């Protein structure tokens, strides 16, 4: 199966597993997906992840996080910059998601960062996704 947008597939797999209240989800690995997963872990949206090599590209197993009463930690995931319509912003125009309650994930020259980290480093880039 050929994917035209592997990042959208990554976000959709997490969104679907989260909505179905699965404990974990397995996603084909890539360097960008590993960076996105690390940001989700740092920001507290997922419990943990593990990368296993399968002889091809590898698999990322993400353990999802839920509240004490089973409520979802991830309320929403939205792909912003798509292959058909890229969305670039300067450091001055970095978006705030829900007035700071969510995060924007930005691909910059300094790597893949959250909107807050990009503001601190004063770099702009391509807005990959919003997570709240």
Curated annotation (Swiss-Prot):
Q: Which InterPro entries match?
A: Ribosomal_uS8, Ribosomal_uS8_CS, Ribosomal_uS8_sf
What molecular functions are annotated in GO for this chain? rRNA binding; structural constituent of ribosome
Q: Keywords on this record? A: Ribonucleoprotein, Ribosomal protein, RNA-binding, rRNA-binding
Q: Which domain of life is it from?
A: Bacteria
| UniProt-listed Pfam families | Ribosomal_S8
One biological-process term from Gene Ontology? translation
Q: Which PROSITE patterns match?
A: RIBOSOMAL_S8 (PS00053)
GO CC annotation terms, alphabetical: ribonucleoprotein complex; ribosome
Q: Which residues form a coiled coil?
A: none
Supply the Gene3D superfamilies for this chain: 3.30.1370.30, 3.30.1490.10
Q: Which residues cross the membrane?
A: none
The record's listing under NCBIfam families reads:
PRK00136.1
Its annotated function is as follows: One of the primary rRNA binding proteins, it binds directly to 16S rRNA central domain where it helps coordinate assembly of the platform of the 30S subunit.
Q: Which HAMAP family match?
A: Ribosomal_uS8_B (MF_01302_B)
Q: Could you give the subunit structure recorded for this chain?
A: Part of the 30S ribosomal subunit. Contacts proteins S5 and S12.
The UniProt family comment states: Belongs to the universal ribosomal protein uS8 family.
Q: Which PANTHER family match?
A: 40S RIBOSOMAL PROTEIN S15A
Name used for this protein in its record: Small ribosomal subunit protein uS8
Q: Native species of this protein?
A: Lactobacillus delbrueckii subsp. bulgaricus (strain ATCC 11842 / DSM 20081 / BCRC 10696 / JCM 1002 / NBRC 13953 / NCIMB 11778 / NCTC 12712 / WDCM 00102 / Lb 14)
């Amino acid at each position: 199966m050929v994917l035209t947008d592997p990042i959208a597939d990554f976000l959709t797999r997490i969104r679907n597993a989260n909505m179905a209240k699965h404990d974990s989800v397995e996603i084909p690995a890539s360097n960008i997906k590993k960076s996105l997963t690390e940001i989700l872990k740092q920001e507290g949206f997922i419990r943990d992840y593990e990368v296993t090599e399968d002889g091809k590209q590898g698999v990322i197993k993400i353990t999802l996080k839920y509240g004490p009463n089973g409520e979802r930690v991830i309320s929403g995931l939205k792909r912003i910059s798509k292959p058909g319509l890229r969305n670039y912003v300067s450091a001055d125009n970095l978006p705030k998601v829900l007035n700071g309650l969510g995060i924007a994930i930005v691909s910059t020259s300094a790597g893949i960062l959250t909107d807050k980290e990009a503001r601190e480093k004063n770099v702009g880039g391509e807005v990959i996704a919003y997570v709240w």
